[in-house]
Structure formats: C-alpha cells, structure tokens
C-alpha cells in the first residue's frame, strides 16, 4: 500500500531533508512524496529538482491550505497523508497505519499519528529540541516500549484521509490561510460528510520540533478560532469537546462517535459560543 505524503515547506531545508530521510529510512514501502515549496530560495527548490521530488512552487508563502490543495493535484495514491516539514517519523510507521486501515471496509475515517516532543506534544519526551541534538536511538527506544493507548478525537498532523473524502470535501478551506484553525475545519467537513472515526494511532509516532518553520519566518497567523466560529456557529474547542470527544491531551479511543450529547455542559458551552458571535457582530458593525 502506497501513501501520497504532502509536505508544505517554507525555507526550512535542513528540517525538510531530515524528515524525508526519516521517511526513506523508516518506511516499509516506497511512498510518494509531494512538496509545496513556498519561496524556496534557501535551496529547497534546487533540492527538490535535483532529487526528482514531486513539487509545486510559489514565489511567496501562499499559506498552508492553498499549499496543500495545490500539491494535492500531483498526488496519485488513494491515501493522502499530511505532514509538517519539521517531523521525524518512527520506524515502521506505515505498517502501523496500514494495519489500522485494514480494519475497515469503508473509507470514512480520519487517522492521525501521535506527536512526541520536548513540550506541547501529545506525549512529552525529551529526545532533543532540534535536529542537531536529536537522539534518534532514544526516540526509537521510547516508541518500542511506550504503552500509550490509541487516542480519541485527535485532529493533529500527521493525518490521513482517503482520496474520495478529500475530493468530497474539497480539501483544505483556504479562508483559514495561513493555517490556524485549518485542521479542525477539515475535521468538521469530514464530520458533516459522515465520518465518525477520528482516531490517533498510538504506534504511529512522529517526533515534532514545534513548528519551527512558522516561527522562524515570522508568519502572522490568522484568527482561526474566529473564522471557525462564524462559519459553524461553534468554536474549535466546542467541536473538539462535544463532537470529537477529544482534547489536546491523551484521551483513550472510545470507538465510533455518535452525535453530541446535549446536556448542561453542551448548552452552557453553546451559549458562550453564541455570545461570542454576538460580540463579533457588534464590534464589526
């Protein structure tokens, strides 16, 4: 089974090559890698051309959502995997993902990897804070011994959906450029298309160096929570809590989801969302 791995990148060549090397080293199959290169004047564009890596290119940073949609047109696999350019994939990651995919006789699922980091990961385990001091052996040893269960309601990269779903929902919503709020928006579109399996596969681990690309290039983020709220009438936190039944921390996988439980907590949080919408309408009037 082959995946199409889309990687948007913005002048982050050292981290990108580190990621691609991990994919080549730790994959059991020869997956398709497709880049979208924003700018690329640091040598990224030359690297992609020299190594015959599929890529799209923009002179300026067009944002995560537009980058994903543009690169998607070069993909050929039925399985679309989105990854950050500052990750390191664990050994046999693809076998763990394939094992999960083989459980289903349909494609209504959204599967994610488990982020490991020094901080801000789903699991915090210090294997280094940059590629220069990354302890690969320590990371692989942790992956082999970790007993963390599969996770509920995860909506973090790397994540995989089927091509048919991507086409049905139209990929990423470009009103969320440069990218804040784009992942929960993607999940909401999947939810509205009938997806009820939102699962983090514990064995599929990546080490994440904390979005260095965004910080190093001083990208000004959009207000994704506001855009999501005005689009759907609820904020991403409400969606994560009451629909996905997940959190930014570890919650063991509970299975196929049902519609939200409309209890006191649901209505209390919903009222807060509606008041926030009213506030935005008054302020923007």
Model-derived segments and their meaning:
Residues 116, 177, 199-219, 227:
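Active-site donor/metal-binding and catalytic loop motifs
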Residues 58-75:
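Glycine-rich, basic loop-to-helix element that forms the pyrophosphate-binding segment
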Residues 21-30:
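Short, acidic, metal-binding catalytic loop of nucleotide-sugar glycosyltransferases
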Residues 80:
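Short aromatic/hydrophobic "clamp" motif used to bind/position activated sugar donors
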Residues 91-130:
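Conserved donor NDP-sugar-binding/catalytic core segment of glycosyltransferases
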Residues 152-170, 176-204:
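A short, conserved alpha-helix in the catalytic core of glycosyltransferases
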Residues 129-152, 156:
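Short, flexible, basic/aromatic active-site loop/helix in glycosyltransferases
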Residues 29, 37-45:
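A conserved acidic beta->alpha catalytic loop
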């Amino acid at each position: 089974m082959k995946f199409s791995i889309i990687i948007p990148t913005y002048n982050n060549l050292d981290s990108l090559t580190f990621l691609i090397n991990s994919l080549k080293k730790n994959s059991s199959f020869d997956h398709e890698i497709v880049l979208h290169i924003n700018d690329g004047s640091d040598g990224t564009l030359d690297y992609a051309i020299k190594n015959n890596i599929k890529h799209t290119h923009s002179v300026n940073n067009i944002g995560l959502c537009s980058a994903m949609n543009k690169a998607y047109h070069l993909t050929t696999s039925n399985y679309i995997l989105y990854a950050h350019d500052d990750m390191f994939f664990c050994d046999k990651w693809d076998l763990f993902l394939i094992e999960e995919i083989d459980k289903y006789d349909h494609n209504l699922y959204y599967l994610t990897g488990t982020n490991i980091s020094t901080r801000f990961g789903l699991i915090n385990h210090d294997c280094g804070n940059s590629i220069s001091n990354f302890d690969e052996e320590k990371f692989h040893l942790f992956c082999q011994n970790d007993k963390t269960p599969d996770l509920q309601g995860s909506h973090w990269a790397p994540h995989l959906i089927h091509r048919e779903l991507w086409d049905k929902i139209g990929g990423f919503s470009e009103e969320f450029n440069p990218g804040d709020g784009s992942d929960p928006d993607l999940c909401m579109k999947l939810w509205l298309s009938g997806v009820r399996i939102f699962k983090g596969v514990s064995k599929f681990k990546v080490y994440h160096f904390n979005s260095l690309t965004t910080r190093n290039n001083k990208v000004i983020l959009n207000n994704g929570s506001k855009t999501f709220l005005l689009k759907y009438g609820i904020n991403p936190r409400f969606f994560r809590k009451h629909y996905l039944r997940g959190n930014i921390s570890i919650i063991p996988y509970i299975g196929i989801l049902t519609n939200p439980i409309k209890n006191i907590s649901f209505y209390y949080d919903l009222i807060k969302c509606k008041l926030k919408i009213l506030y935005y309408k008054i302020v923007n009037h």
